[in-house]
Each structure stands twice: as structure tokens, then as C-alpha cells.
Amino acid sequence: MRRVAVVRFPGSNCDADTLRAAEAAGCDAYYVWHRATDLAQADVVILPGGFSYGDYLRSGAIARFSPVMGAVVAHAQAGGPVLGICNGFQILCEAGLLPGGLMRNAGLRFLSRPVWVRVETADTPFTHLYTPGETLELPIAHGDGRYVAEPRVAADLEARGQVVLRYVRENPNGSLHDIAGVANAGRNVVGIMPHPERRVALVLGGADGARIFQSMEARNATHQTGDVRVGRDQHLRV
């Protein structure tokens, strides 16, 4: 059973949903307050969505300096899996663990609705139970979700297969290359703007996000990408 640390910052508001989704996938999930400096007991670290520090200055810009981030960086540099969801994605970019950044939506409005995304790579600890090319319906809820990067960085992401999720049918926020999620070069750090924890059971409107969390536990059991497959219709019990 993988131990999953869900980091809580002042202003986090998706931490409980994220912890419950990880538990339902079979993980041993627990909260870590932003003042903590030790993540030695964690196999996986998740930075959940919300409005850390009220999104003052810039989304994720202050959280990046929280004491816990030193441990998050160390965990990532040691090859440990790290997932940032929405505000967590913003924090990972601010911390330099992921390339690029997230800016104000092109329409200058907060968006809260389901969108469609395509899985671009299954070669991460969080997507290996999906099939590349598979489309998912997941909710978004952000005002600063427009992914940006320098042309050279964007070209490298595409060439190296580091784009994890891509918006399809529409680009809701003006993200460069329709990018909804990226990974670092080692593919152990992943940031996504959609909220998979809000789509882990049919009672929530769908289960397309369940395998994000199931992937974490399945990889622990097999230690090999692709050894375990979960059917499209399977979902977590909540």
C-alpha cells in the first residue's frame, strides 16, 4: 500500500476530496501541513487544488516558499512521484519542478465546468492505467489556467513526450498547444489543471479521473508500467 501525502496550504480546498480519492484507490493517504519539513514517510506527494495563500501576488507564488516545499523538491529530485492538481500545478511551476507557467485565462474569467482532455502519454506514475489517445471528461475550476512557455521549452515538451493531457473539442483558457498537463523530463513530476478527484465515481457524474489515483497504487503492486489495466467502466467506491 502506497503512502500518499496530501499537502495542505492555507487556502487549499480540494485536499479532502483528493485524500478520499487516494484512499478509495487503496492508498494510505494522510495530510501534511505546509509547515512540515519531512516527507520521508511518503511514497507519493500530491499538491491539491485551491487558492493557496489567497492567490496573492500570483497563483502558487507564495506557496512555493512554504517550508514543506523543500521536502517536496527533495522527494522529486530523488525520483519520488509528485502530482500537482490545479493550484498544485501552479505551485510546481513556481517551484521550478515543472517547465512553463500558468497565467490568467484568455477570457479573463474564472471557469468552472467539465471539459474534454486527451491522454497524450501513459508513461507517468499517474497515467499508466490509461491508453494514449483516450479522451476523458474532467472538471476544471480556475482563473489562472492558461499554460504558457517559451517556444523552445514548448517544442522540447512536444518532442520529448512530456505533454500529459491536452484539451480537445475546445481550448477553454487559451493554453499554449491546448496543454492541460505536463510532466518533467523524468516523468515523476506531473501537473494537471483538471480535477480528477471530482470524477472518481458515477455518483459524481463520471469516473474518468479514478485511474489517476489507481495508477499510483497499481504501480506500487507491479513496479512496471502496463502490467495492470483497469477497465474504462470501473470506478472508485465513495
Question: Which residues fall in each region the model found?
Answer:
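Structured helix-beta-strand junction loops
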Residues: 25, 78-79, 159-161, 185
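Beta-strand-turn-beta hairpins that frame and shape the catalytic cleft
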Residues: 1-2, 133-135, 184-189
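NAD(P)-dependent dehydrogenase/reductase Rossmann-like domain
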Residues: 163-186, 228, 235-238
